[in-house]
């Protein structure tokens, strides 16, 4: 496994491979990340992973400085998983002095995480576009847990004619339903016990949908009701949106819907989602 820190180093190492799978991460890896690596390993003869805590996707009052980092542990996990190349650039390597070009999707900034975290998806789209240009992957793997990110990346690839196939991998969960996240490490014991309420709220609404409910506001109310039963949970938003446009729905049609939410437990903010398949899909 080669560990590379500059664009020039990576491009030189990349030249040894024809087909390459790629998993972009911010490090502090968990089984959700490793599930992406495992799928990449199954589908591609070589796999690259990036570790870069991207400052441009964090807001001024967010957790960039304290975002968990453990590079040695990450490298041991990636070596054991059979990764070929690891790209760990510095902030200066990715954003040199005078950097001034960004990828912006105005529609993404108006809904869900984009509305709650101004500028977040400008940072996400820009860094992913840069990584695609540096890594030149055949396929790139993303988790369904960050549902809006997958929509943003897919649209960017389509709009900018980027020659990479995007593969979405199902969310990996703890036995009690909590979606794996690097931010789960922030939860104290009481908050950790309360956190599966996100999964329960989503599952309850999904069960109502499976039983025939198609009114979106009814499903929002179902999710809010479950969340209200957990005193530590403070919802940021609860959404029933079109799975491609992420616009809020009045009624769920043939395309199905994305159930999603962001919930705070004191200073810890967790997100989760559940994709409702459309009729006949």
UniProtKB/Swiss-Prot annotation:
One Gene Ontology MF term: ATP binding
Cross-referenced CDD domains: PanC
Residues holding beta-alanine: 57
Reaction equation(s) it catalyzes: (R)-pantoate + beta-alanine + ATP = (R)-pantothenate + AMP + diphosphate + H(+)
Binding annotation for (R)-pantoate: 57, 149
Cystine pairs: none
Annotated metabolic or biological route of this protein: Cofactor biosynthesis; (R)-pantothenate biosynthesis; (R)-pantothenate from (R)-pantoate and beta-alanine: step 1/1
Cellular component, GO, one term: cytosol
Keywords carried by this UniProt record: ATP-binding, Cytoplasm, Ligase, Nucleotide-binding, Pantothenate biosynthesis
Active site: 33
Annotated binding of ATP, by residue: 26-33, 143-146, 172, 180-183
Biological processes, Gene Ontology terms: pantothenate biosynthetic process
PANTHER family for the chain: CYTIDYLATE KINASE/PANTOATE-BETA-ALANINE LIGASE, PANTOATE--BETA-ALANINE LIGASE
NCBIfam families, sorted: cyt_tran_rel, panC
Function as written in the Swiss-Prot or TrEMBL entry: Catalyzes the condensation of pantoate with beta-alanine in an ATP-dependent reaction via a pantoyl-adenylate intermediate.
Subunit structure: Homodimer.
Miscellaneous information on this protein: The reaction proceeds by a bi uni uni bi ping pong mechanism.
Protein name in UniProt: Pantothenate synthetase
């Amino acid at each position: 496994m080669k560990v590379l820190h500059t664009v020039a180093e990576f491009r030189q190492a990349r030249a040894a491979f024809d087909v390459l799978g790629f998993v972009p991460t911010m490090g502090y890896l968990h089984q959700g990340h490793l599930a992406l690596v495992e799928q990449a390993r199954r589908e591609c003869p070589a796999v690259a992973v990036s570790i870069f805590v991207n400052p441009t996707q964090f807001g001024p009052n967010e957790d960039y400085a304290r975002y968990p980092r453990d590079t040695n542990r990450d490298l041991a996990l990636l070596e054991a998983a059979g990764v070929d190349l690891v790209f760990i650039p510095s902030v200066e390597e990715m954003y040199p002095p005078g950097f001034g070009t960004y990828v912006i999707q105005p529609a993404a900034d108006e809904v869900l995480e984009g509305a709650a975290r101004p500028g977040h998806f400008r940072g996400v789209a820009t860094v992913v576009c840069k990584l695609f240009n540096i890594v030149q992957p055949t396929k790139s793997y993303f988790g369904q847990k960050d549902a809006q990110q997958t929509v943003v990346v897919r649209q960017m690839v389509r709009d900018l004619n980027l020659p990479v196939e995007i593969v979405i991998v199902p969310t990996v969960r703890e036995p009690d339903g909590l979606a794996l996240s690097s931010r789960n490490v922030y939860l104290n014991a009481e908050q950790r016990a309360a956190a599966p309420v996100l999964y329960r709220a989503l599952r309850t609404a999904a069960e109502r949908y499976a039983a025939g409910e198609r009114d979106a506001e009814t499903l929002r109310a179902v999710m809010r009701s479950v969340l209200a039963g957990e005193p530590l949970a403070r919802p940021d938003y609860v959404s029933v949106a079109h799975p491609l446009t992420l616009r809020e729905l009045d009624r769920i049609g043939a395309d199905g819907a994305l159930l999603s939410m962001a919930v705070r437990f004191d200073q810890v903010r967790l997100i989760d989602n559940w994709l409702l398949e459309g009729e006949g899909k």
